[in-house]
Amino acid sequence: MNNKIVRSWPLLLSALLAASCGGGGSSAIAPTLESITLSPSILRLAPGASEQLTVTATHSDGSTAVLPPSSETFSSSNVNVASVSASGVVTVAANAAIGNTATISATDTASGVTTASAGSAQLTVTTAGAVPTATSVSAAKATVANNAQCGADIMPYYWEIGDQNGPLVSGSQGADSTGAPVLVTTKLAVASASKLLYATYVTQLRGSAAALTSQDTNFLHFTSGYSNMGDSSGPVCPQTLDPDDVNSCLQLRNPQGVLFSAQDPATVGRFYYDSGHMENHASQFTPLGTVIVGSLGKTIAALLSPKISIAFGEPLISGGAFLSSQDYATVLQRILDGTLAMRNALGINPVCTHGANCNAAFSPIPEPWHYSIGHWVEDDPLTNGDGAFSSPGAFGFYPWIDASKTFYGILARAQSPENGEQHGYASAQCGRLIRHAFMTGVEQTQPIPTN
């Protein structure tokens, strides 16, 4: 084709577009506000305690953004239990009875859009007693020893609960076919627990949770539309890549022949649990795209803590990390003490993943948890969800931080991923029981948390 024609084509196209638009302005329709949600979605506060709410908007084009509290009107279903200020701070009444509840909602002043029930915050008044209680450790250990959810089906495993200063209680259950137990120093493939590590890396790279861009948010809570990699726990980016890095992996194709780097318009704005979101984000918005696999873990670890060691078996950002429970716990401790900016990103910009009124495309977790920045929010009321933040992996590695951002926990194991993400979910079913036993000081004897 004639070069002059090729070079003049953009100018001709611009002229035609200008003519069709009347010579000025734009015919693009601005996205409209479709829904707003509050986070944390579950509040467990003692009488007199307060908590700041965050308002997240979802627009018609699938994009999300944090809204300033000044643009919203907040309300409480029971002001005798809890009030909410104009700036979105919830405060429990000093004389509120333990067990009382209230629903906190918000209305966008400009559009009139109001939080649906799933987007509102559910508050329960709890005791102000210190945790751990005198029986927290014994209750956690008894739950591990006696509850079927923590039994032989998920052994061997290591478990731990701690705070920002280190472990408070831990143990190792069972052994593998060689007689070896899982220890705090055992290096494991953590699969999708890599997602929380990457989200923590990105938030630290930006400098704060508030500095996360709308693009960061859409990629990290899996609504970007980059859903063509799948979430296989087997090798996705083979070692035959040259160079062996994220960018090269994205040039591969899925079984349907679609590039990993391709966006699917059908999933833009919809939650779709897929490795493609983080892989493409790392390539487009961070320096990790050209980092070879042998240096990938070191590069991420350097921003998280000088004390930890992370390795990657393949350049799969969302699922390829190997590390010990000891090193993963260090990251969780630094989140809790605020050294890592991820503390303020926990639970923000949550999207729904299940339900009749949820426009999600795919979730591997059978409960309607919400998904935030590289982690789940365990807020299903049918299983007495406590709002903990977690990132279970397909092999069974389950890290969590409780809703109050005071304690962390790990249940570490590595089993073959024949059931997709279900080893991670099985670990979560045990891990949440241990957490609840520790938080309440009461042994958990049922399949879901009670008491």
Regions found by a protein language model. Name each.
Residues 128-138, 385-451:
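Structured C-terminal helix/loop/strand segments within mature extracytoplasmic catalytic/sensor domains
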Residues 350-411:
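Active-site Gly/Thr loop motif
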